[in-house]
Structure formats: C-alpha cells, structure tokens
Amino acid sequence: MKSITQASFMKGIMFTFTIAIISYILAKFPILHTIGALAIAIIFAMIYRQVIGYPEHIRPGITFASKRLLKFAIILYGLKLNMGDILGKGWKLLLIDIIVIIFSISLTLLLNQIIKGNKDISILLGIGTGVCGAAAIAATAPILKSKEKDIAISVGIIALVGTIFALIYTAIEAIFNIPTITYGAWTGISLHEIAQVVLAAGIGGSEAMTFALLGKLGRVFLLIPLSIVLILYMRYKSHSSQVQQKIDIPYFLIGFIIMACINTFVPIPSLLMNIINVITTLCMLMAMVALGLNIVLKEVISKALKPFIVICITSICLSGVTLLVTSIMFK
C-alpha cells in the first residue's frame, strides 16, 4: 500500500513537472511570451481536466505541488528583493506603492459589492493587482483560507488582464513618447506581474527598466506588512465569530522575509541566482498546473465573469491615477 502511495506521489510530481516544462518552453516563443508561462500552465491543465478528467490515481503528487511547492516557490521569491535598494533609492516609489495597494484592494471590493460578484475571488484579485500578481495571490491565499479553485481562477484572470495592459502600455509609450523615468515608474507601480513590467518597460530603455523594477519590487516588499495585516484581520474575524479558528503566521512568509534579508546583506553570484530563478519559476508552474486541474469550466464561466469585469475597471482606474501621479512626481 505504501509503495502504491509513493508511486502515485512520484507520478503526480512528474505529471505537473512535465506540463510545467512544456509551459516554460512555450512561453519562450514570441506570441506566447506575452501570455506568460503561468497562464499557459493553467490553461493547459484546464484543457486536460475538461477533455480527459482529473487524474485521481496521481492525486497525492498533484496535491503536494499545489500546496508545498507553491509555498516553497514563495519562499524563494524573496530572493528577488533587495530591501536596501527599495528603501534607499526607491522610497518615493514605495510611498506610491502603499497607496496603490490600498487603492486596488479597496476599489476592487467596492466594485464587487456593487455588481454582487464573488467576494473570495475579488479580494484575491485586488491583492494580485495591488501587489505582485500570482505571487501575491499565492502568498495570501492560505492566510485567507481561499479555495484552490478560487486561487487558480484568480491567477488566470490576473495573468490575462496584466498581459493585455502590458501590451497597451507599450502602445501608449510608442504613440505618446512619455518621459523615460515617468514611463518606467508608471509601469512598475501599476502593472500586475514582474514579467509584465519587464515586457512593458523594455521599450523605454535601461533607465525606464531601473525605475520600473524599483517600483515593482517595492510592491513585492509590501507583501510582508500586508500579510501581517491580513493575519491580524483573520484572527480578529475568528475571535468575533462563534467558531474559533487558529490563524498562525505562515512559515513560508517567515521564509520569504529571511530570503529577502539574505539577498540584501549577502552577495549572491549571478549564476546561482539564475539557477534559483529557474527553480522558483518551475515550482510556481507546477503549482499552477495542480491548481488548474481543479478548475471546471462551467464554474469558471459562472464565477469569473463579474470578478473579471471588476479587475478590468480597477486596472483602468489604477493606470490613470498612477500615470497622473508619476507625471507630477517625476517631471
């Protein structure tokens, strides 16, 4: 019995790994590059689920990928942060980042209440829009006790909307020729994923890219205090309800902070950093495959339409406000 469980576990790991590798390779192609590997992995898994069904015989490995590997990827994600640069060079952007996060979450929840959409998905989308896309959703979902299906739907929506906006940004820059620093800062503080920021900021040159990454990584840095606020909120909510729930500080958040400190104070060779980045990406992709397998297309259609509309409106408002702010601050 134990050998059967181990075999199921390994087959599940290999299954998610195989689709992750395929998604990683496909994302290197010109057109698919704009979609991103995370979205490709989820779409691939969704199609598999609709056509073939959920592979029950390898569930243990798939469950491991959706839970453990996802948290491991978040821990490694902390190595992208250099707190010295963010607090030193990018303090102006950090102040804007705080406003961006509050604005995104508040507006998303307000709009969702107006159109009576799915609150669980909308709060994940608000966090993903305000902070750092899929990574923020993955990091805060365990704190919020989110369902795996809601996580997968949220990541898919964020990937789609963020990619569309990144392409729109490049078109706007090409047409209106926004000043380099303003454009870089704008992309960094308003686009959803790091990959989307890099895609959009690339057209502005190296100076635009520097400010874009400072703005974006400032939002990643703010994932730490935001997570603490969410933990306190969930504890308060638990104490206020009749059913008491234990809300612990997630170990992966502690790991994320430790990794950020290591990258800030310990020089890491570029070759090693590149290897870690690939491992982080593959772990995240394997987790997205596992989450995508939980999605039933009918549920996506019924649950995702209103949150999709909400996040599009939020993203449009966020883009407009942040462009105005960066134009004033970085003349």
Curated annotation (Swiss-Prot):
<feature type="transmembrane region" description="Helical">
    <location>
        <begin position="154"/>
        <end position="176"/>
    </location>
</feature>
<feature type="transmembrane region" description="Helical">
    <location>
        <begin position="93"/>
        <end position="115"/>
    </location>
</feature>
<feature type="transmembrane region" description="Helical">
    <location>
        <begin position="183"/>
        <end position="205"/>
    </location>
</feature>
<dbReference type="InterPro" id="IPR018383">
    <property type="entry name" value="UPF0324_pro"/>
</dbReference>
<feature type="transmembrane region" description="Helical">
    <location>
        <begin position="122"/>
        <end position="144"/>
    </location>
</feature>
<feature type="transmembrane region" description="Helical">
    <location>
        <begin position="275"/>
        <end position="297"/>
    </location>
</feature>
<dbReference type="GO" id="GO:0005886">
    <property type="term" value="C:plasma membrane"/>
</dbReference>
<feature type="transmembrane region" description="Helical">
    <location>
        <begin position="7"/>
        <end position="26"/>
    </location>
</feature>
<comment type="similarity">
    <text>Belongs to the UPF0324 family.</text>
</comment>
<keyword id="KW-1003">Cell membrane</keyword>
<feature type="transmembrane region" description="Helical">
    <location>
        <begin position="249"/>
        <end position="271"/>
    </location>
</feature>
<keyword id="KW-1133">Transmembrane helix</keyword>
<feature type="transmembrane region" description="Helical">
    <location>
        <begin position="308"/>
        <end position="330"/>
    </location>
</feature>
<keyword id="KW-0472">Membrane</keyword>
<keyword id="KW-0812">Transmembrane</keyword>
<dbReference type="Pfam" id="PF03601">
    <property type="entry name" value="Cons_hypoth698"/>
</dbReference>
<feature type="transmembrane region" description="Helical">
    <location>
        <begin position="31"/>
        <end position="48"/>
    </location>
</feature>
<feature type="transmembrane region" description="Helical">
    <location>
        <begin position="69"/>
        <end position="88"/>
    </location>
</feature>
<protein>
    <recommendedName>
        <fullName>UPF0324 membrane protein SERP0111</fullName>
    </recommendedName>
</protein>
